Amino acid sequence: MASDHVDVLIIGAGLSGIGAACHLRRDCPDKTYAVLEARDAIGGTWDLFRYPGIRSDSDMFTLGYSFKPWTAPKAIADGTTILEYVRETAREYDVPRHIRFRHRVLRAEWDSDTARWTVHAQRTDTAEIVVLTCSFLFACAGYYRYDEGYTPPLPGVDAYAGRLVHPQHWPDDLDHSGKRVVVIGSGATAVTLVPAMAQRAAHVTMLQRSPTYILALPARDRLADAVRRRLPAKAAYPVVRWKNVLLSTVNFQLSRRAPGLVKRVLRRAARGLLPVGYDVDRHFSPRYNPWDQRLCVAPDGDLFTAVRDGTASVVTDTIDTFTASGVRLTSGAEVPADIVVTATGLNLLALGGLTLRVDGVDVDLPSTVAYKGMMLSGVPNFALTLGYTNASWTLKADLVAGYLCRLLRHLDRTGQQVVTPLPPPDAERVPLIDLRSGYVLRAVDTLPKQGATAPWRLHQNYARDVLLMRHGRLTDEGVRFSRAGEVTVPEDTRRPVASERR
């Protein structure tokens, strides 16, 4: 990078960060930018996770970028293919030369007099502190800790003589061929791992405390195949993308408005894929409503096939203690295991652990309110990417990056330099992420909040957000535009969080 000052500094070179850089290249080609990436490769999640079967749990027509058609055969794709898609996109837009690898961002300090961020990063290879400045800071570092997955207390684990691994740090030398494997967990990672490992293992047991809703979907989208045969890729892609957006929106809205009906449909579908007499209620019927937690996807019903074929089984119970040869359950049964995989979740980490300071005052993230799900009250010229909880991550990431480019062009047109979100006029606050999953509940008190009404309310609705973020007004009651040296957030708008609803 020729200069240590850029117009836009992007944190993270994963799916969101690469997309943000491409949007800048497409929509704001006059803006200078750099990307700081803590690791030594492009790809984020898709470069980090290496466990067997790693794949998307959203279709790639919506997880892919809006400007880069997904052309691979499978709609639910493997991690290697997704990683190559991200890297290919980066190359097409000349992003790699703007990336500083092995730079972990530590803190960023905003100065209103100069209308600039001063960003402190540490090189992960030399421990050297690097200082850069930027006019706009864009956090695309994901939502979880890369260096540490979540593992709950495991009673007696020190007595276990087998191999214990976490999917987030999969060992290169682990060979599970012919081994007895226990996968602890029932979320997306477990649902992915079990059928993949069952192909070579002696047997795989999915040990879950409680079940998850699992939906079998075809790995290939037959309608997409038909459309792609008749239309060029650039024409077919948005058609299939919107078809999938509408289907997922209907699924979510129906789950919210008629949860009993959706429960019955999912239960009936699972029962049809499992052996006759299988205890579907115990192992595949959760106590909560659909979309209180994310639905898991089984491409081509692979998990159900493994259970039906006897290469995998599901045990719903709690752990009493580990033994030398496996796991003893509260029921008294013991599950033998040569390998135990703790697919027990992630540790959420807001902004990748970045600390923010505005004019010498530390920003308390839980006291901020998200504006349009992408900026924080009282924090000037700062944006973050937080994807949808009920649809693919990239749908929202694309909208956020596009909206940021609209903001930058607006600032240039009007001669302004600073945009600062304001807190909502009412005192009501709700959690930013509306899920009851364990990884969310463990971290909810460390995250920003959302308000009760727009533009501080997240609606988790892509079609609605397209109207708001691509075509809506940039000037509203939620933001203030100003120049360097001007007061950006009046004192009387710095309201405390007086009430909170969960």
What are these language model-derived features?
Residues 2-5, 9-11, 15, 19-20, ...:
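Rossmann-like dinucleotide-binding core of oxidoreductases
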Residues 6-10, 15-99, 208-209, 272-278:
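Beta1-alpha1 glycine-rich phosphate/pyrophosphate-binding loop at the start
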Residues 11, 105, 131-144, 181-184, ...:
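Short hydrophobic core segments
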Residues 51, 343-411:
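Glycine/threonine-rich phosphate-binding loop and adjacent beta-strand/alpha-helix elements that clamp
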Residues 70-88, 100, 184, 254-263, ...:
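Short beta-strand to alpha-helix junction loop
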Residues 73-145, 306, 321:
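Feature captures the FAD/FMN-dependent oxidoreductase FAD-binding
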Residues 273-329, 333-336:
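Alpha/beta-hydrolase fold catalytic core
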Residues 398, 402-502:
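C-terminal active-site-capping segments
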